Amino acid sequence: MTIDKTYPIFTVRWLTVHGLAVPTVSFLGSISAMQFIQR
């Protein structure tokens, strides 16, 4: 019973972490690419 309540929270947290991490990585990638182009 406790596992059923903890599992959805864990998956939502996992999705939130990935949803925030993916744009951050692409944002950093674009910044590094612009730095490369300027040099």
From Swiss-Prot:
Show the stretches that span the lipid bilayer.
14-30
Q: How does it sit in the membrane?
A: Single-pass membrane protein
Q: Which UniProt keywords apply?
A: Chloroplast, Electron transport, Heme, Iron, Membrane, Metal-binding, Photosynthesis, Photosystem II, Plastid, Thylakoid, Transmembrane, Transmembrane helix, Transport
Residue numbers binding heme: H18
Q: What is its main location?
A: plastid
Its GO CC terms are: chloroplast thylakoid membrane; photosystem II reaction center
Which SUPFAM superfamilies does this one have? Cytochrome b559 subunits (SSF161045)
Q: Tell me which Gene Ontology terms the entry assigns under biological process.
A: photosynthetic electron transport chain
Describe cofactor binding as the record notes it.
Answer: With its partner (PsbE) binds heme. PSII binds additional chlorophylls, carotenoids and specific lipids.
Q: Name one GO molecular function term.
A: heme binding
Q: Does the keyword Disulfide bond apply?
A: no
**Which cofactor does the UniProt annotation name?**
heme b
Decide whether keyword Cell membrane is in the record.
no
Compartments where found: Plastid, Chloroplast thylakoid membrane
Under the subunit heading, UniProt states:
Heterodimer of an alpha subunit and a beta subunit. PSII is composed of 1 copy each of membrane proteins PsbA, PsbB, PsbC, PsbD, PsbE, PsbF, PsbH, PsbI, PsbJ, PsbK, PsbL, PsbM, PsbT, PsbX, PsbY, PsbZ, Psb30/Ycf12, at least 3 peripheral proteins of the oxygen-evolving complex and a large number of cofactors. It forms dimeric complexes.
Q: What does this protein do?
A: This b-type cytochrome is tightly associated with the reaction center of photosystem II (PSII). PSII is a light-driven water:plastoquinone oxidoreductase that uses light energy to abstract electrons from H(2)O, generating O(2) and a proton gradient subsequently used for ATP formation. It consists of a core antenna complex that captures photons, and an electron transfer chain that converts photonic excitation into a charge separation.
UniProt lists the family membership as follows: Belongs to the PsbE/PsbF family.
The name of this protein is Cytochrome b559 subunit beta
